[in-house]
Amino acid sequence: MGEDRVSFEVMRSNQLPFVEWGNYRYSLKRNGGRNVTFVAWGYLRVPLAGNVPNALFCLSKVKQMRRLTRIDLPRSPASVSPYDLYCEPRDEKVVMSVLDSDMVALLRNNKFSFEFAEGYFYVHFAGLFRFWKPETVTLLAEIVSRVEAIRLSES
């Protein structure tokens, strides 16, 4: 989906946990390439300890978040306000138990969508991360610390 895919302003840790954050962009061309729309977002990737089922918590009111990926997972009828939850029905209980209410509130207050995929916790922001702002880096570091605390408590 899309063309001209590029990650930029990517930062990766060189020690455990192997965390990555950055910005991602691609373009959608319509009408034979005359109309180009750029879709961009910030992301954070943190490894998880256990085998957590794949799930996507997508902010209901942020249109750009719905375009991030083609959602192959079924939508859960019991969404977590203000998130639409996409996961297999049998996995909903496990997925919900991974995050505490403080973490969900932190993500909601900062308008992040998030997902569990292939052993990683991903956070998506509908827009670009502004890494030159100390509060952006502090916020991402807080999320990493919380996920790492959950990971360590499970192992």
Residue ranges and their predicted role:
Residues 1-155:
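Charged, low-complexity intrinsically disordered regions
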